[in-house]
Amino acid sequence: MNKLFRSKSGVLVSILIVFALVAAACGDDDSESGSSVVDTPADDTETDSPAEDTEGDSAEAAGEDYSDFKVVMILDGSAEDGGWNTTHLRSGNRMVDAFPGIDFSYVEAIEPGQPATNAFQDAVDAGADLVIGTTFYQFDMMEVADENPDTYFLTWAGFEDQPNVGHFSQATEDGRYLDGMVAGLLTESNIIGYPVGFPYAEVNRGLNAFTLGAQEVNPDIEVRALYLNTWFDPAIEQQAAEALANEGADVIAHEVGAQVYATVMAERGGYVFGYTNDWSDFEPEAWAGGFLIDWSTYYIEQVEDIIAGEFTPGISYGGLAEGWIEFAPYGPAVTDEMLELVEERKQQIIDGTFDMFAGPIFDNQGNEVIADGATIPFAERDFCCDFLVEGIIGEIPAT
């Protein structure tokens, strides 16, 4: 795994305002804060590429019992949102499979701020050995972590140093690039719609990677981006989907939560890509495919290290090569010839022989943002991007 260690720096501070604006990142904005503790996780979602469970197999074979180890996961929305939180819970379930008997529970609909601080403290008081925060809970978590050095904490997209805290983020660009290739091959209008939630680094990075992937196979495409200022609002997302379809988009990818894009594309004879969940059974004729995030590799590694007394704080960032990105089944419109191209590029990303951000790359204002011979190193991608590449119709909103 590419495990990165960064201390607080000017680069990190510069993104602080953006993270604060989207502190409820990737959750359900309409959810009320709550503290519903659930001891029995939802069933795992099957995919074509399940995470390897070699550690779990060996633990089970050895008859080891992990019932004395307690993990509590803090979700910022519903575990059944069909998106971000469902993905985290799916990864948590895979962690459970790797450690027979492990005590795993989760708490839903916890907003950043005092509700999150209270939830972290409640988890500690309940005897948690490890607490996992699935959105930008860094500041809420740090206060509790500092006062409880014998409990370990993991939080998404954080960066501050603490001996008992780890941070993690996912290289969604690996999956987005390959989804973009398929989209570029499927579109007939050469117009692809791409509604997103908020204008922060991971969103822009994925949008750029998707566009670059589509341009590799179809240089004539344009990607129309809409920033919706929400992670989940079916009414707003319905309007966005219809507006994009009316502008000629016959393919839609998205980084927001509702399934309305599939419905609209099915009605219009187009195709939809999912965001980190398998919706292939919903409007199957319109389903094109979609990458999935799997944090279980990271979760399992952290539990192993804690049990062994070898926990290492810092930032972890993983993609295809690290097993953090996989794919849902492709839809019926995706041909074997398309898949052959995608699989070849996928293997090159895993091997490190292909660099999607190799320059020269220009933004959609005509500025060279990555020079010829330059790139964005994998270790620095977590904080990209504050630009949109050429071929994207749209602007990053001011924050």
Segments (PLM) and residue ranges:
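Bacterial N-terminal signal peptides that target proteins for export
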Residues: 2-13
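Bacterial signal peptide processing site
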Residues: 27-29
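A residue-level marker of the well-folded mature domains of exported/periplasmic proteins
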Residues: 32-399
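Alpha-helical interaction segments
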Residues: 15-17, 74
